[in-house]
Curated annotation (Swiss-Prot):
HAMAP family assigned to the protein according to its UniProt record, in alphabetical order: Salvage_MtnN
Catalysis performed (reactions): S-adenosyl-L-homocysteine + H2O = S-(5-deoxy-D-ribos-5-yl)-L-homocysteine + adenine; S-methyl-5'-thioadenosine + H2O = 5-(methylsulfanyl)-D-ribose + adenine; 5'-deoxyadenosine + H2O = 5-deoxy-D-ribose + adenine
Record-level GO cellular component terms: cytosol
GO BP terms in the entry: L-methionine salvage from methylthioadenosine; L-methionine salvage from S-adenosylmethionine; purine deoxyribonucleoside catabolic process
Oligomeric and partner information: Homodimer.
Role, per record: Catalyzes the irreversible cleavage of the glycosidic bond in both 5'-methylthioadenosine (MTA) and S-adenosylhomocysteine (SAH/AdoHcy) to adenine and the corresponding thioribose, 5'-methylthioribose and S-ribosylhomocysteine, respectively. Also cleaves 5'-deoxyadenosine, a toxic by-product of radical S-adenosylmethionine (SAM) enzymes, into 5-deoxyribose and adenine. Thus, is required for in vivo function of the radical SAM enzymes biotin synthase and lipoic acid synthase, that are inhibited by 5'-deoxyadenosine accumulation.
Protein origin, superkingdom: Bacteria
Natural source organism: Klebsiella pneumoniae (strain 342)
Active site: E12 (proton acceptor), D197 (proton donor)
InterPro entries noted in UniProt: MTA_SAH_Nsdase, Nucleoside_phosphorylase_d, Nucleoside_phosphorylase_sf
Protein name according to UniProt: 5'-methylthioadenosine/S-adenosylhomocysteine nucleosidase
Similarity comment: family membership: Belongs to the PNP/UDP phosphorylase family. MtnN subfamily.
Binding site for substrate: G78, I152, M173, E174
Amino acid sequence: MKIGIIGAMEEEVTLLRDKIENRQTITIGGSEIYTGQLHGVDVALLKSGIGKVAAATGATLLLERCQPDVIINTGSAGGLAPTLKVGDIVVSDEARYHDADVTAFGYEYGQLPGCPAGFKADDKLVAAAEDCIKALDLNAVRGLIVSGDAFINGSVALAKIRHNFPQAIAVEMEATAIAHVCHNFKVPFVVVRAISDVADQQSHLSFEEFLAVAARQSTLMVENLVQNLARG
């Protein structure tokens, strides 16, 4: 099995990258892909860059160049579920765009023409992630993760997301684009991120302060998930 791992920022991939053995680097299309073994498992780690276009471009290159069997999207997210605090884990059962609107033509809010309203995460990957959460005794929430090309730190933007997606547990800037590409390539995916802020008016300050905490927690989860998947 080869596992693809995608993070947007240097801070979100550096801890994992440093643990990859026999590491080789592919630089292409504004992305960097690091291949090798993580705990003896073949992996391809992508640093995509921030935002939906960067994430989709990188995910496509990763799938074409490295042909992983599954994709794990890692990194940080803004918490929406009331029980979440900094360092907690969110696991996707679905990903949707919060900034797509073609409702004038009868589509659901967040749905693009020719696409499902949401992109479903793979049940087996979700179950494996929840096994790791239980083993590590982490606080976590599973549910809908929404994505858009905006860092959410104001009451108006937050209220709009809560209105359109009251069930959403977290918000970030890449996951749904990655899920969209995985859907097109028919490759299973799951989003496993750690909370860096709670998407409020102080979220930009919280993000800067707690990104390192989120990176450590998401790295811990991904390492355990990789080993869990390799064991089958």
